[in-house]
Design a protein with these regions (language model features):
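Catalytic domains that recognize anionic headgroups
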Residues: 2-730
Length: 730
């Protein structure tokens, strides 16, 4: 037998070579998969990527090597002591080290795969691996299943870490025993000085806790806005939904103000959020689709007013924190001073995500805080950024403001409820059928290439069986609960920091989502069919000092948020705001504002469905847009399609009872009128029964489009209201 020291070095060498060989095999496998285009662009943009950005694709594959090297180092640090400890029980030769190293590597890989299956099942089809776990729960009960879960996710890693730590502590003790005492003394002295520095708090910049500002003015209220992309108001339990999707939001509503019928003027994120924070309609601020040019963005930045800018002038700290759905704030900050969001709407980000998704080690080991620092691009990917990361950043910001007592406006924005409805397993399983085994098990299985390169996708999805619709809806509801948990964490932190009674909270969304209502399928912003679901968002306010909770069923708009919040903190509204303050309703000064809703659709990704009609349409996205290298490689609408996109827009005027829609057709304008009281899903056109209603709403729409004047319900119907207009004989 060789000397013990030689044996240790020999074992370490074999472990290192085996681990690095294993990781090299993983890397080469990912490269071959990428080269085979098993997951990539299969539309017109693929040609652009290969011909003009091949070097970027190569570089992206090289960048991930640092991840492989770190994983290899971690594997060696953990596996080496385990192999050594095994060797103390039974001696083995070179190949014994190799297969034991491979065994531990496989166990570690299996552990991380199991965690990935439970937390992010959408990263791959692991149903063949997860089947035994589901069967265990069905046969033995959830108690046994939970015990196995704890064994795998807690006991196994803890045992491995304790064994490795014990080994290294023993080795460290042996080293210190042989080391020179002066070295030990120096180390202790340095550690002591650092400890004293930390304990004393030397150098920490403290700000006095001030309840009042200079001049004796009372400190203004903070404002926290929490939103989720595609959050439907009618899927919150506080709004009567049949599932308990929003217990934390419900508690806010139970103490606050719930505007039950709040609508966004456009159901597309960039345009909607611009309208929300500028309090202007899209045809006023100029951002009317999701592929604006630099000139359009510059114009909006220069000319549009904003909630953030008004509050910043009052001394507020203003910040927006979000994941990939908040990427628009990079180009359109809307007055926010601190922008902590991902950069998603960028062709190079898309290409990077295609590359990174081939390398399994990234979701396995680096979808966390450390990984996001090592690979900043991960925060820009829809598959990687998690609500926990956004919430942690929001909480950190709240702690900072609690320390300096500066009033703040904070917008936390999440992608929780956005397509394709991906959640960790425990959310996905909340309301889905455990026996379901179709394509939408973990997410809405959307083929991105069909979405980008075709316009007839509605025809395919309109035939979806009822059980598939129920599965997708249940997945969406799990997403709502995931967002609700994030809201709960933020509110708890405000209370912990003593800020809750000094903070106005608004829970909302940028728009809703279609979930296969009549004459629509999925998505948002392409049609007013099916009802209000794509434009209807929560508007739940927590207002400190409110005497009793309120519910308002009358119409409100996201345009009204900015003037309302300014009113509540005592700041005058910007004269160019087009929204109205809802504060008079909250304070009980008025019973009604008589607001009417005016809206438009956004970019038309696929053809609309109007029975018996032929709506206007445009070519698919990969024909109408291009990648602008002078605008940070963003997707930009081609000049020749600017007018075409505007001409395909539907417009809508809605009052409490009636909804008038004007749709551009191939041969003529298509006008429809719906009585929402009798027909909430807009299936029966009533324009011939209510010709006067149709005429009045049509005139109000024309005036809004040409002069920007938005009529009130009294101006549209007269002082007696819409119910006085009688139908003609059938």
């Amino acid at each position: 037998m060789p000397p013990p020291s030689l044996q240790r070095r020999h074992i370490l060498k074999i472990v290192v070579l085996t681990v690095f060989g294993t990781l090299l095999a993983w890397y080469l496998s990912a490269i071959l998969s990428f080269a085979g285009n098993s997951y990539g662009f299969n539309n017109r943009f693929s040609e652009v990527a290969i011909q003009h950005h091949w070097w970027f694709l190569v570089w992206s594959n090289l960048v991930v090597l640092k991840g492989y090297l770190l994983v290899a180092a971690g594997y060696v640090l953990l596996i080496y002591p385990l192999v050594r400890l095994w060797g103390k029980v039974r001696a083995f030769a070179r190949w014994g080290v190799v297969w034991r190293t491979l065994l531990f590597a496989c166990l570690l890989y299996g552990f991380f795969i199991f965690k990935l299956m439970l937390e992010k099942p959408y990263f791959g089809d692991y149903s063949y691996l997860l089947g035994w776990y589901d069967a265990l729960g069905r046969v033995c009960g959830t108690g046994v299943q939970d015990a196995v879960h704890a064994m795998i996710t807690q006991v196994f890693p803890l045992t491995a870490i304790v064994c490795a730590a014990g080994f290294y502590l023993f080795e460290l003790r042996r080293w210190f025993t042989r080391a020179a005492r002066p070295l030990l003394f120096s180390f202790s002295a340095v550690a002591g000085i650092l400890a004293l520095f930390v304990v004393s708090g030397y150098g920490v910049n403290r700000v006095p806790d001030m309840e009042e500002l200079a001049g004796g003015k009372k400190r203004p209220k903070n404002i926290v806005i929490l939103g989720s992309d595609s959050l439907r108001a009618d899927h919150l339990s506080c709004n009567g939904y049949h599932r308990l999707t929003s217990p934390n939001i419900d508690r806010i509503a139970a103490k606050g103000v719930n505007f039950e019928r709040c609508l966004t003027p456009i159901a597309s994120t960039l345009e909607s959020l611009t309208s929300m924070f500028s309090s202007q309609y899209p045809h006023t601020h100029g951002v009317r689709h999701m592929f604006p040019s630099r000139a359009m963005v510059d114009r909006a930045n220069q000319e549009a007013p904003s909630l953030g800018a008004e509050l910043k002038r009052q001394g507020y700290d203003t910040a927006v924190i979000g994941d990939w759905c908040a990427c628009g704030f990079n180009e359109l900050p809307m007055g926010f001073e601190k922008i902590i969001v991902s950069d998603f709407d960028n062709f190079r980000v898309y290409m990077s995500e295609v590359v990174f998704l081939h390398h399994q080690i990234l979701p396995l080991f680096f979808d966390n805080h450390v990984g996001h620092m090592l690979f900043p691009k991960l925060k820009s990917f829809a598959n990687y950024m998690t609500p926990e990361v956004v919430t942690d950043q929001v909480i950190d910001r709240i702690k900072q403001r609690a320390g300096d007592r500066q009033p703040f406006l904070l917008f936390g924005y999440y992608s929780c409820t956005h397509l394709p409805y991906k959640t960790p397993t425990h959310y996905a399983k909340m309301w889905t059928d455990p026996k379901y085994d179709g394509p939408h098990k973990h997410e809405l299985a959307l083929n991105v290439d069909e979405f980008i390169g075709g316009t007839d996708i509605n025809e395919k999805w309109s035939k979806l069986p009822r059980k598939e619709v129920e599965q997708i809806t249940a997945l969406y509801d799990g997403c709502v609960r995931m967002f609700d948990d994030s809201v709960g964490r933020v509110v708890a932190e405000l209370e912990k920091q003593g800020l809750l009674d000094d903070t106005i909270i608004l829970v909302t969304g940028d728009h809703g989502d279609d979930l296969f209502e009549p004459n629509c399928t999925f998505g948002h912003g392409t049609t007013f069919n099916g009802g209000d679901q794509a434009n209807h968002v929560p508007a739940i306010f927590y207002v400190p000092g409110l005497e009793k909770p309120q519910r308002h069923a009358q119409l409100s708009r996201t345009l009204d948020f900015a003037p309302t919040l300014l009113d509540l903190v005592g700041v005058p509204a910007q004269p160019r705001f087009e929204g109205a303050s809802l504060a008079p309703l909250i304070r009980g000064e008025k019973k009604s504002l008589g607001l009417a809703y005016f809206g438009e659709t956004s970019y038309l990704f696929f053809r609309r469905t109007i029975p018996g009609e032929d709506p206007l349409f445009i070519p698919p996205m990969d024909e109408t847009t291009f990648i602008d290298p002078d605008f940070d490689f963003h997707f930009v609408l081609k000049d020749k399609f600017q007018d075409a996109v505007l001409k395909t827009k539907e417009h809508c005027v809605r009052t409490e009872r009636f909804k008038y829609i004007r749709t551009p057709g191939v041969n003529r304008s298509i006008e429809r009128l719906f009585d929402l009281r009798e027909d909430p899903h807009c299936e029966r056109d009533m324009k011939t029964r209510y010709p006067e209603v149709k005429a009045r709403l049509s005139a109000a729409m024309d005036e809004w489009l040409t002069t920007h004047k938005q009529s009130t319900t009294a101006e549209i119907y007269g002082i007696l209201g819409e119910d006085t207009l009688q139908p003609t004989a059938p």
